[in-house]
Amino acid sequence: MPRDFPRTRRVGEQIQRELAELIRDELRDPRLGMVTVSEVTVSRDLAHAKVFVTALGGSDEDNAKTVEVLTRAAGYLRKLLGQRLRIRQVPALHFQHDTAFDRGDRLSRLIDEAVEEDRQQHDDDKPDNG
């Protein structure tokens, strides 16, 4: 696992906040719905930033389209970030779909199913008093 450096983490957090605002307020692409910027990891030399995004309520196709739209707008977003951030060089933005939400949703459904099966099993094991 790569070592975490305080400066890269701070820059990543600031880029995350600013990008979320810029995507919401500045991008006017009709293909872009509600987008969550869930994490930004910045390389040690601050040259590259991986931006993890999810289209809210979106399918895999919607998420792929969102990543494509944001990738095409990366230069514009980088320019806007340069106007807001106080760093010498704004990292190149690399957008990726964040699968953590999907995995969390899947785990939640599996847990719900297991609880329901356990409840049914428990109800079947009860003796009939009547």
Curated annotation (Swiss-Prot):
Major localisation: cytoplasm
Record has Cell wall biogenesis/degradation as a keyword: no
GO terms for cellular component: cytosol
Ligase as UniProt keyword: no
Top-level taxon: Bacteria
The entry's keywords: Cytoplasm, Ribosome biogenesis
Signal peptide (UniProt feature, chain positions): none
Compartmental location: Cytoplasm
GO BP, sorted A to Z: maturation of SSU-rRNA
GO MF annotations in UniProt: ribosomal small subunit binding
Subunit structure: Monomer. Binds 30S ribosomal subunits, but not 50S ribosomal subunits or 70S ribosomes.
Similarity comment: family membership: Belongs to the RbfA family.
Protein purpose: One of several proteins that assist in the late maturation steps of the functional core of the 30S ribosomal subunit. Associates with free 30S ribosomal subunits (but not with 30S subunits that are part of 70S ribosomes or polysomes). Required for efficient processing of 16S rRNA. May interact with the 5'-terminal helix region of 16S rRNA.
HAMAP family (UniProt xref): RbfA
Name recorded for this polypeptide: Ribosome-binding factor A
Source species: Alkalilimnicola ehrlichii (strain ATCC BAA-1101 / DSM 17681 / MLHE-1)
